[in-house]
Amino acid sequence: MKIIKRNGAEVLFDPQKIIVAITKANDSVVPSARMTPIQIKRIAEDVESAALNMNRALSVEEIQDMVEDQIMNQRAFDVARRYITYRYNRALIRKSNTTDEQIMSLIECNNEEVKQENSNKNPTVNSVQRDYMAGEVSKDITKRILLPKEIVSAHEQGIIHFHDSDYFAQHMHNCDLVNLEDMLQNGTVISGTMIEKPHSFSTACNIATQIIAQVASCQYGGQSISLTHLAPFVDVSRQKIRRLVRDELSDLPGITEEKINAVAEKRLHEEIERGIQMIQYQVVTLMTTNGQAPFVTVFMYLGEAKNERERADLALIIEETLKQRYKGVKNEKGVWVTPAFPKLIYVLEEDNIHEDSQYYYLTKLAAKCTAKRMVPDYISEKIMLQNKIDKNGEGHCYTCMGCRSFLTPYVDENGKPKYYGRFNQGVVTINLVDIGLSADKNMDRFWEIFDERMELCHRALQCRHDRLTGTLSDAAPILWQHGALLRLEKGEPIDKYLHGGYSTISLGYAGLWECVYSLIDRKLTEPEGEALGLEIMRKLNEYTAKWKKAENIDYSLYGTPLESTTYKFAKCLQKRFGIIKNVTDRSYITNSYHIHVTEEIDAFEKLALESKFQALSPGGAISYVEVPNMQNNLEAVLSVMRFIYDNIMYAELNTKSDYCQVCGYDGEIEIREDDGKLIWECPNCGNRDQSKMNVARRTCGYIGTQFWNQGRTQEIKERVLHL
């Protein structure tokens, strides 16, 4: 069994240390108040037994809490007082220097929590370590100076999660939709250099990758671009290539316009291939100031095209994008594997969902790609037009910002809908499970605590908003001055765009499944559980609507994709409430409104049920189904896609995509338990070295490739198939 030290390092549990610590406290009291050596040894044994039953690595603080409880149970109150006083004094010493140990442990790669915090960051790399070092300083400043104590306390107890405190010290926003069209058509400035409108498709792709990198370095959340904004440059290249071909072949006999066009189209396809390849490889190899590849989503929506020519050219780009993602990228052994980025989103619409539709061939290619590489994910134009309705009563279809955060419909001062160039200010998530358990099955008490926690979240969200208020455009010129989001003057504040619905700010929620079960012993898949779950969702929306009306700030409800935080919430719940069957008996809690990963339910029933909850998450949410290897059953994949089109706005299919670099095995790398810890192992050769295997799993909308903490790993291990 292992424990996690305060600096994040993971070490073997040693019961002798408990005996030594209690003995020191025991020796400092009068003889009549002392415990016997047998009592002290029994305490160490009981703590070890309780820790083993937790099925995860406990922190030093949790072990010490158990020791305190056991001493009190022995009624050795004087010993307990000395033990608690010693802990308190040590805590004061540690508090005087809050970051040194954390920073040193991550530099020396001893910090297990940091190693497993982000499934797309490699914590052994210098650039990532620099980002983590800055993050530790930011978290320290945020905790001691920038946030009210009540918010810090609630965050530390796992009552709420104040997202991205490692960036909160700076005036940075979360995620956005990049206005690539404006930047390419009207020019932009990158690092003080004027970039004019490109004169070819390949140049447009190159500029796009530079924009992606610059944007990623100026924010902490994801970004999305649309292939539609690149489509006009296909015809620019077409006309340019035609002129060149005509000049080359003009002296040859029998050269017709038809032959010129045929040669030109062949060269055009080669340029499209190079351009898309450039985006794929640049995105996975670029390193931003965040110490990672840009978290970027590429949107593929035929309905965005302005005319038939642009639509046909967009189809060419989409086709090439899907082909290249299906192929994958080579790992260091030269083997084709699944890349994490860019995330791809494909819109299902009338012109591509039916077998006799014009672009059905693209949908079949998308299904083939999903079965092998887990992308693209799917948006239903049909359902989104029903869910995203603006103040004029018009429905809209558009992409999320990065993983799943959706803007709310917005009409500008000219009466036109606007999505590209807008952003999200940040997220605070409520732990619904904690409210449910705190109520102790009393519904009146539940709603009282719910109201109190909502106001706590509101104050935390106001802190996020206030941190951005007064931010000048100079903080991130690529965003605020040169078109990625806006074109403000130098020194101009962004305040106007924090109000009026231009940007959103998100109230996140997690653990609806466990919350409902803790209250009424019913699952979301049962009628009573579903009804209560939907009631809670409607109540959450009532609060965001109330805040929005009062402050003219676009508060929106968001289905939080917990990554490392799922483990933190689970540990906090176990500490506060103990182990409760079907609620706190795992090292993770369920994301947003999702059906529990262990629930036996088929794909269609799951999507149909979750669609009701997704419609009540206007700030973003995504549903998924877990499937086996479907590469030889694409018709089944297509049937799920057709169901998505008719029933749910945004969904994805999860499969596995692994490779062992030791033996070449390309089946599923499995999760084993070893000495209380979950580890990854090749079932063919027994390789357990994570640096010598490629494992890709859906983590929270994105694909993760750098492994996960113990809570998320347990969740991945316990996922059941839905198809």
Model-derived features with residue positions:
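Long insertion/accessory domains within large nucleic-acid-processing enzymes
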Residues: 684-723
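Amphipathic, well-packed alpha-helical segments that form the structural scaffold of globular domains
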Residues: 23, 458, 462, 513-517
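Conformational switch/transducer regions in large eukaryotic molecular machines and scaffolds
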Residues: 14, 677, 699-702
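Charged, amphipathic alpha-helical regulatory modules used
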Residues: 1-110, 717-722
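Conserved catalytic cores of very large enzyme subunits
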Residues: 89-93, 99-501, 522, 526-688, ...
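Metallocofactor- and cofactor-centric catalytic cores in central/energy metabolism, strongly enriched
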Residues: 272-276, 280, 518, 712-718
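Contiguous, well-ordered alpha-helical segments that form the cores/surfaces of helical PPI scaffolds
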Residues: 232, 300, 505-518, 538, ...
